[in-house]
Amino acid sequence: MTTQRSPGLFRRLAHGSLVKQILVGLVLGILLAWISKPAAEAVGLLGTLFVGALKAVAPILVLMLVMASIANHQHGQKTNIRPILFLYLLGTFSAALAAVVFSFAFPSTLHLSSSAGDISPPSGIVEVMRGLVMSMVSNPIDALLKGNYIGILVWAIGLGFALRHGNETTKNLVNDMSNAVTFMVKLVIRFAPIGIFGLVSSTLATTGFSTLWGYAQLLVVLVGCMLLVALVVNPLLVWWKIRRNPFPLVLLCLRESGVYAFFTRSSAANIPVNMALCEKLNLDRDTYSVSIPLGATINMAGAAITITVLTLAAVNTLGIPVDLPTALLLSVVASLCACGASGVAGGSLLLIPLACNMFGISNDIAMQVVAVGFIIGVLQDSCETALNSSTDVLFTAAACQAEDDRLANSALRN
C-alpha cells in the first residue's frame, strides 16, 4: 500500500500548486534554520543556484517578450478602446506614484550581502537622466551580458517595430522564440520552492530570525499600497469617468474578478472570468473582447507597485538619497516596466533590475532583491494579480458606462 501511495504523493508535490510549494519551502527553511544553523548555511547553495538561474534568463526574457509583442501586433482593430487604454496607463502610473508616496511614508529595508560602498549612486535627476540615455545606446550584446535592461528594452522595441514589416514566417519564428524563453522561465520558476528553501534557511542562519520582521514589514507596505490603490485611487479614477458613486462597481469587480485572480495568480487565466463579468454588466462586446485581453497585457498597477516598493526598499537599504524628480522618474520607469511584466509568473519581480539600474545598483544586488520578492511572493503575487485583473474589468466597465451616458445625453438633447 505504501509503495502505491508514494508515487502519487510525489506527483502531487511535483505538479501541485506553486503557491503551496513555496509556502512549504518557506516553512521548511525557517524550521531548518531554527534546528541547525550549519545545515541551513550549507543549503544556501540552493538559493544561490536559483538566483543565478534567474539572473541568466532575465535579460533574454525581456528582449524576446517585448520584441515578439511589438512585431506581432495586429493592425486595423476597429474598436473604441482609446479611453480604456488611457485609463489603463493612467491607473498604472497612479499606482506607481502611490507606491512612491507609501514607500516614503513607511520606508522598508532589505537584508542584502552588499553595502552602499559597492555602488556609485547618482547625485540627482540630471545624472539619472544621463545614465538612462547612455544605457539606451549600449551595444545589444553588451547589454545582454551585463544585464543593462534599459538598453535591452530599447533594442527590443526597435527590432519589434522593424520586424512588423517582415514576413509571417519571421514573425512566427520570433513568437516561437518568445514562447521558448517563456518556457525556460517557467521551468526555472518551478524550482522556486527549492531556491526559497535555501534562501530562507541561509538568510535566517546568517542574520537571525529578526529578518522575518523586515520581510513582514515589506509585505505590509506592498499589500497596504495595493489596498490603497484598489479602494481609493481606482474609485477616484472611476468617479472621474462616470461621475457617480464608484464603489458598487469597484466592489463588484473585486468580488467577482479579484477573488478568482487571487487564487489563479494569472491575469491571462482570469480573462474568461472577466469576459463573463462584462457580459453580465451588459457592456459592448466589441469593446470588451479587445480591452480585456489588452488589459491582461498592459494594465499592471500591481506590478508597478511591486517594482516601485522593492526598488525603493533596496535604495533605502543601500543608503542612496532620492530627490523628488528622481522619485517621479521612478514612477514612469516602473509603469513602463509593469507593462512588460505580463505573461510570465513572477514577471514583475524579474523586471525590478531595470528600475534598480536608475540608481546605479548592480545586477547582482538587484537579483538579490528579486529573490526577496520570491520569498514574500506567496501573498504578494496573489494580491498583485487580483489588483491587475479586477482593474481590467473595472476600467472597461467605467469607460463603457461613460460612453453610454454620453450617447444618452446626446439623444436627449436631440
UniProtKB/Swiss-Prot annotation:
<feature type="transmembrane region" description="Helical">
    <location>
        <begin position="218"/>
        <end position="238"/>
    </location>
</feature>
<keyword id="KW-0472">Membrane</keyword>
<feature type="transmembrane region" description="Helical">
    <location>
        <begin position="16"/>
        <end position="36"/>
    </location>
</feature>
<feature type="topological domain" description="Cytoplasmic">
    <location>
        <begin position="67"/>
        <end position="83"/>
    </location>
</feature>
<feature type="topological domain" description="Cytoplasmic">
    <location>
        <begin position="2"/>
        <end position="15"/>
    </location>
</feature>
<dbReference type="InterPro" id="IPR023025">
    <property type="entry name" value="Ser_Thr_transp_SstT"/>
</dbReference>
<dbReference type="GO" id="GO:0015175">
    <property type="term" value="F:neutral L-amino acid transmembrane transporter activity"/>
</dbReference>
<dbReference type="GO" id="GO:0015194">
    <property type="term" value="F:L-serine transmembrane transporter activity"/>
</dbReference>
<dbReference type="GO" id="GO:0015826">
    <property type="term" value="P:threonine transport"/>
</dbReference>
<dbReference type="InterPro" id="IPR001991">
    <property type="entry name" value="Na-dicarboxylate_symporter"/>
</dbReference>
<keyword id="KW-1003">Cell membrane</keyword>
<comment type="similarity">
    <text>Belongs to the dicarboxylate/amino acid:cation symporter (DAACS) (TC 2.A.23) family.</text>
</comment>
<feature type="transmembrane region" description="Helical">
    <location>
        <begin position="180"/>
        <end position="200"/>
    </location>
</feature>
<protein>
    <recommendedName>
        <fullName>Serine/threonine transporter SstT</fullName>
    </recommendedName>
</protein>
<feature type="topological domain" description="Periplasmic">
    <location>
        <begin position="201"/>
        <end position="217"/>
    </location>
</feature>
<feature type="transmembrane region" description="Helical">
    <location>
        <begin position="332"/>
        <end position="352"/>
    </location>
</feature>
<dbReference type="GO" id="GO:0015195">
    <property type="term" value="F:L-threonine transmembrane transporter activity"/>
</dbReference>
<dbReference type="InterPro" id="IPR036458">
    <property type="entry name" value="Na:dicarbo_symporter_sf"/>
</dbReference>
<keyword id="KW-0812">Transmembrane</keyword>
<keyword id="KW-0997">Cell inner membrane</keyword>
<feature type="topological domain" description="Periplasmic">
    <location>
        <begin position="37"/>
        <end position="45"/>
    </location>
</feature>
<feature type="topological domain" description="Periplasmic">
    <location>
        <begin position="105"/>
        <end position="142"/>
    </location>
</feature>
<keyword id="KW-1133">Transmembrane helix</keyword>
<dbReference type="GO" id="GO:0005295">
    <property type="term" value="F:neutral L-amino acid:sodium symporter activity"/>
</dbReference>
<dbReference type="GO" id="GO:0032329">
    <property type="term" value="P:serine transport"/>
</dbReference>
<feature type="topological domain" description="Cytoplasmic">
    <location>
        <begin position="353"/>
        <end position="414"/>
    </location>
</feature>
<feature type="transmembrane region" description="Helical">
    <location>
        <begin position="143"/>
        <end position="163"/>
    </location>
</feature>
<comment type="function">
    <text>Involved in the import of serine and threonine into the cell, with the concomitant import of sodium (symport system).</text>
</comment>
<feature type="transmembrane region" description="Helical">
    <location>
        <begin position="46"/>
        <end position="66"/>
    </location>
</feature>
<feature type="topological domain" description="Periplasmic">
    <location>
        <begin position="321"/>
        <end position="331"/>
    </location>
</feature>
<dbReference type="Pfam" id="PF00375">
    <property type="entry name" value="SDF"/>
</dbReference>
<keyword id="KW-0029">Amino-acid transport</keyword>
<feature type="topological domain" description="Cytoplasmic">
    <location>
        <begin position="164"/>
        <end position="179"/>
    </location>
</feature>
<feature type="transmembrane region" description="Helical">
    <location>
        <begin position="84"/>
        <end position="104"/>
    </location>
</feature>
<feature type="topological domain" description="Cytoplasmic">
    <location>
        <begin position="239"/>
        <end position="299"/>
    </location>
</feature>
<dbReference type="GO" id="GO:0005886">
    <property type="term" value="C:plasma membrane"/>
</dbReference>
<dbReference type="GO" id="GO:0006865">
    <property type="term" value="P:amino acid transport"/>
</dbReference>
<feature type="transmembrane region" description="Helical">
    <location>
        <begin position="300"/>
        <end position="320"/>
    </location>
</feature>
<keyword id="KW-0769">Symport</keyword>
<keyword id="KW-0813">Transport</keyword>
<dbReference type="GO" id="GO:0015825">
    <property type="term" value="P:L-serine transport"/>
</dbReference>
